[in-house]
Amino acid sequence: MSLNAEIKAQIVADNARCANDTGSPEVQVALLTAQINHLQGHFKEHSKDHHGRRGLLRMVSQRRKLLDYLKRKDVQRYAALIAKLGLRR
């Protein structure tokens, strides 16, 4: 159900602000988006997995909080991230 290490490393490399950046809001949102997209396929097959859906909703909520934080701190970085990931807003 989780992403493998190579995919995570690629996502971090694509969204990092500097060389060893793994904790910036951009990286965290990109990782959460990849996990959410991965889980959507799971729920198409397993529609009655309510326990897993709770985890998915928690991830969506965490992503929303990080996006709100980024929007408060730097609107330009927020807009660039939304465009890059193809999220609605």
From Swiss-Prot:
In its UniProt record, which GO terms are filed under biological process?
translation
CDD domains membership: Ribosomal_S15p_S13e (cd00353)
Extract one GO cellular component term from the record.
cytosolic small ribosomal subunit
SMART domains reported for this sequence: Ribosomal_S15
List keywords of the entry alphabetically: Ribonucleoprotein, Ribosomal protein, RNA-binding, rRNA-binding
Q: What Gene Ontology terms describe what this protein does at the molecular function level?
A: rRNA binding; structural constituent of ribosome
Spans through the membrane:
none
- Quote the function comment for this protein: One of the primary rRNA binding proteins, it binds directly to 16S rRNA where it helps nucleate assembly of the platform of the 30S subunit by binding and bridging several RNA helices of the 16S rRNA.
Family designation: Belongs to the universal ribosomal protein uS15 family.
Quote the subunit structure annotation: Part of the 30S ribosomal subunit. Forms a bridge to the 50S subunit in the 70S ribosome, contacting the 23S rRNA.
Query: Could you tell me what this protein is called?
Result: Small ribosomal subunit protein uS15
